[in-house]
Amino acid sequence: MNFWSEEAPMWEYEHAVETAADRGAIWRLWSDVENWGAWNGGIEKIELRGPFAEGAEIAMTPPGEDPVLLRVTALGEGEHFTDEARFGGLVLRTTHRLVPLGEDRTRVVYRMEISGEGAEEAGPQIGPGITADWPETMAALVELAAR
C-alpha cells in the first residue's frame, strides 16, 4: 500500500522514534484527537468534527495563531493516518505511521510533504517551522503511551 502522495512533493521531512510503548496505546492517543494537547505543546485548542476516520475534519489552533483546518485523508486502524491542510495552492500532507519492529518494539514515523503551486519556494520557508517540534512532540507521545 502506498501511503505517500502520487504527486512529487517539493519539500519533505521525516522524523522517527523507536519505542517499547504498546502500539495500541499510541494509536489510542492518536485517535483521541480532543486530547492531543496532553502530549503536543504546539496545540492551544483542538476540535474533531466527526469520528476519527477518513473525511473527518480537525480544527487545530496553535498558541497565538488562527485555527488550521486539517482533513483526515487516509486511515488504517491501528497503523497509520494522514491529514492534509490546504493553503491556497499548497497542500501540507502529514502521515503518521506505526511500524512494528518485532514483538515489543515500534517505530513511530511522522512524514510531512508540501506540494502544489509555489511549494518549491514556500516549502523550505514554512516546513522547518512546522516540523521543528516533532522530536519533542513524538518523545512526549511515546512517553505518555508507555505509562
Regions found by a protein language model. Name each.
Residues 37, 51, 61-109, 113-118, ...:
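Hydrophobic-ligand binding "helix-grip"
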Residues 113-147:
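A conserved amphipathic terminal alpha-helix motif
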Residues 21, 38, 67, 132-136:
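Generic recognition of short, well-ordered alpha-helical interface segments
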Residues 1-50:
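Hydrophobic ligand-binding cavity/cleft-lining segments
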